[in-house]
Amino acid sequence: MTRSGKNHNAYIQAREEARCMFAPSSASPEFVYTDSETTVLQTELEDTIREIYLKNGSNNESMEDVRTSSSLFTLKRKKHVEYCLRNIRELHPTYISLNSSRTWIVYWLVHSLGVLGELELDEDLQTDVVQFLSSCQHDSGGFGGGPGQLAHLAPTYAAMSALVTIGTKEAMAVVDVGKLRTWLMRLKTVTTTKREGGEDVVVGSFAMHIDGESDVRGSYCALVVAHLCKVLDEELTRGVANYVAECQTHEGGVAGEPGAEAHGGYAYCGIATLALCNMIEKKKTSEHRIGMDLDAFEEWLVNRQCGVEGGFNGRTNKLCDGCYSFWIGASFPLLDMVRGGEQSRRLLFEERTLEDLTSAQNAGDTELTNMAGEEDRMDDAGDVRNAPTGDDGESLLLGILRDTAAEMCSLKEENKLSIEINDNANFQKEPLAQMRLSFNARALQGWILGCCQSEKGGLRDKPGKSADFYHTCYCLSGLSVAQWYGELPVLAGGTDTANERKENVVEKVNVLVNVVESKYRNWMDNFESCDRDVEME
């Protein structure tokens, strides 16, 4: 029997034993264990994923051989580029229901091309995108989902992110900054409440549109757009961090609004909003600020990584979904940024290419010190949950997780990793932040590359689903997070990505905005000096 067969049988046996524990008994005849729709789907998904991961395994192949199988871990870059290009100019009539999401579609596809490193190939396409987005700008400020539509914070974020990705002078000239900021302030609501102890607490939130609903998406979209336009200030951030804290749930995650369920997308918006607030509120203000429980938030994030699949789910007891590769994955470095201050901020916004970092490492400009022993590294690598074990071995994914753990450094106070990179012509070295691995980046890459790619191009929610623009965007962004933020060897310029093949490496995304890092830097360096009178052809 093959190792994969033993592992699968052991998993089935363990599952049945667990089921028997909840079977009706004479002591409690009223209790009957029955599968829910979710547990049935979860079981089916795990079986599918296990088959994908183990289909090339044999007694003669090591776990590493299986992990690096080209049939599992090859980025279908060309097919994904073709998928994006054939959909960005013209859509089938069945897409009419997405008429109010046209700015989103542009962003999803343009950003996907950017992450794949292919956006520069078509200047005509860039010009067409800029002209279209310009037509979506509302007279009162902000952008709508299409030309002539209501100004809304969600498509405003999408339009701004697409313009940042294009990054030309024409793209920068589109935005009417004055009207945009006025519109943002019209969307803001500030209330003052009293907490136990008598403190006055200011809570600020943003409606998604005039007279619309307020939730944590609004806070994120408003502040990140203001940040990109360089008008983010204390008037806009006042009380917003308190609103995010009010949205934290008993689980530790962040809900869309106070009292709702924690969700991966809202969690990202919440932690990114705190990072944006911290950019402005560098010193403690006189106003009382509710403290968000960051440890509980991290615990909630860690528990989103699925033991068999390797990807993330967005809510407790829900299925793994490719889009959370970004929503959850990007929340880890943002959490580090909120905790770590300026050093982590430099780590997140340092503009470096893989070639730059590799050259620095080869030249001896990267110094790795205080390496811990394997047992300590295993202890610090985190808890691996729900990964089945066989009688004489581990499942493929559990092995990958443990292999990864064995290669990680302990980052406790006594065992820290110091990274120094040559940063200027005078060879002055400045230490970057010490980043702790809180999710398994290799497992995440395996999930995206092995389970979320469509053979026809594009990426998807999970096996059995069709590719779509949304999942293509966020799966690719999640892949970038796994490669550039998840493991220290990648940050230090190694090729420790799936297959260790350079052709699998995508562009680094800026996790605060979800645009390619080099595009973000170009925008932030040149936006203020842009001539607002540039004429569109």
Task: Give the positions of each predicted feature.
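Preference for long, amphipathic alpha-helical scaffolds in soluble/luminal domains
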Residues: 1-537
